[in-house]
């Protein structure tokens, strides 16, 4: 099993880091590539991540041709022939995001069968919003033996109100509605940048979607879609992770290709702490004098609130800031598991339901730790950089789902870090 080894203590991260295409954008784009019955789809700026390989295999399992040119960060999808309607269990079970193929398969074929998905263990994350929305559009849904089966000769436009602005459900329903008969309105829709990117992608294909980035989406169904070329939006969570890394280490880092507007909630909290964040021609520069930073209170919320996918990394920053900071996690339950591992490194914290109190500013010590999910992996590595001594981060299967060559990028910025596959 691979592990990351960090010699921490006095590292100051400096230099430039290039941000990859967004994992959370490319996965639904691959699902949407199921929809076109004409032409090929080409995705550029694709990150080389295990989740991308998994989604490629989910799509291939539908008898769709998928070619991944890793050297060019480019995927070509040809779904123009007959496609199957059952997604392969062995791949769907590995990744939560794979549920978003349900809507496209159903819209394209009139029938779909998808296994209950897997992924990080950070809460129950029910899929009822996906299923309720499809039922509102006329689908008959059955769940049996761990499988979800959906049937609809042709989906019908509907008015859908979502009890929570779920990103995955918004994506699934928006894709399904592109080929529905009539107009579909989704109220309380997710507003994340990845939703906007997906809507732009679908509109290029011939879909008619209005309101992406707002609470109300309006989709007028069409009879068919065609393949297109598209550049995947930059990964705001990877960008945010390196912003936090610079802030934790009194660093001076230019995060190339980072999009200011996509990272506004995080940038606001960094500035409140006393971090210097400036927009430059080629990206965002973060500079900090960590001992002078101030504690803050943060609450995770759906976009445009503070992203839950930055919660773990930001609590790592709170750990090195003098004073008591508070993190309130409102999106997922069970997402403070990394704090238990950070306590092995000397962190003092208390957790009461959805609130974590972080007593920061004490010198942390290196220790062997176990990553529990994707963003926790990054948080533990960043903590290892500032901790005195050697930190070993185990269970990197989560890290590889969302970060490409993370240790190499940190090493180029000055961290003493390596990856080992020794037992």
From Swiss-Prot:
Species of provenance: Streptococcus pyogenes serotype M3 (strain ATCC BAA-595 / MGAS315)
Molecular function (Gene Ontology), one example: UDP-N-acetylglucosamine 1-carboxyvinyltransferase activity
Active-site residues, record numbering mapped to chain: 120
UniProt-listed GO biological process terms: cell division; cell wall organization; peptidoglycan biosynthetic process; regulation of cell shape; UDP-N-acetylgalactosamine biosynthetic process
Key word Aminoacyl-tRNA synthetase present: no
Catalytic activity: phosphoenolpyruvate + UDP-N-acetyl-alpha-D-glucosamine = UDP-N-acetyl-3-O-(1-carboxyvinyl)-alpha-D-glucosamine + phosphate
Protein name, as recorded: UDP-N-acetylglucosamine 1-carboxyvinyltransferase 1
Entry keyword Cell division: yes
Family: Belongs to the EPSP synthase family. MurA subfamily.
Binding-site list for UDP-N-acetyl-alpha-D-glucosamine: 96, 309, 331
Coiled-coil intervals, chain numbering: none
């Amino acid at each position: 099993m691979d592990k990351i080894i960090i010699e921490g203590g006095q590292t100051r991260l400096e230099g430039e880091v290039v941000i990859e295409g967004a994992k959370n954008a490319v996965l639904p784009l691959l699902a949407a590539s199921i929809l076109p019955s004409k032409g090929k789809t080409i995705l550029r700026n694709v990150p080389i991540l295990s989740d991308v390989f998994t989604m490629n295999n989910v799509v291939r399992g539908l008898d769709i041709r998928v070619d991944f040119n890793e050297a060019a960060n480019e995927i070509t999808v040809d779904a123009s022939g007959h496609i199957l309607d059952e997604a392969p269990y062995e791949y769907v079970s590995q990744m939560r995001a794979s549920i978003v193929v349900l809507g496209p398969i159903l819209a394209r074929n009139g029938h779909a069968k998808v296994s209950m998905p897997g992924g990080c263990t950070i809460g129950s994350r029910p899929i009822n919003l996906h299923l309720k929305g499809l039922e509102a559009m006329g689908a008959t849904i059955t769940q049996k033996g761990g499988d979800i089966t959906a049937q609809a000769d042709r989906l019908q436009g509907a008015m859908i109100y979502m009890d929570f602005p779920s990103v995955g459900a918004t994506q699934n329903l928006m894709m399904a509605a592109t080929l529905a008969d009539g107009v579909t309105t989704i109220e309380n829709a997710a507003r994340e940048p990845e939703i906007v990117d997906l809507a732009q992608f679908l509109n290029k294909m011939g879909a008619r979607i209005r309101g992406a980035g707002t609470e109300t989406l309006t989709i007028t169904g069409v009879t068919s879609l065609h393949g297109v070329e598209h550049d995947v939006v930059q990964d705001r969570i990877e960008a945010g992770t390196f912003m936090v890394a610079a802030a934790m280490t009194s660093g001076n880092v230019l995060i190339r290709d980072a999009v200011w507007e996509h990272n506004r909630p995080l940038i606001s909290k960094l500035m409140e702490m006393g971090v210097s964040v400036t927009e430059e021609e080629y990206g965002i520069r973060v500079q900090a004098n960590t001992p002078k930073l101030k504690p803050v209170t943060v609450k995770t919320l759906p976009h445009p609130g503070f992203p839950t996918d930055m919660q773990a990394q930001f609590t790592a920053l709170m750990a090195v800031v003098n004073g008591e900071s508070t993190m309130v996690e409102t999106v997922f339950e069970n997402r403070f598991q990394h704090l238990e591992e950070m306590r092995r490194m000397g962190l003092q914290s208390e957790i009461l339901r959805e609130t974590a109190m972080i007593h920061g500013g004490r010198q942390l010590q290196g220790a062997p730790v176990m990553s529990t999910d994707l963003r926790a992996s990054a948080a533990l590595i960043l903590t290892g950089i500032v901790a005195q001594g050697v930190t070993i981060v185990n269970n990197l299967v989560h890290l590889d789902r969302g970060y490409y060559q993370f240790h190499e990028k940190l090493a180029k910025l000055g961290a003493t870090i390596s990856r080992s596959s020794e037992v």
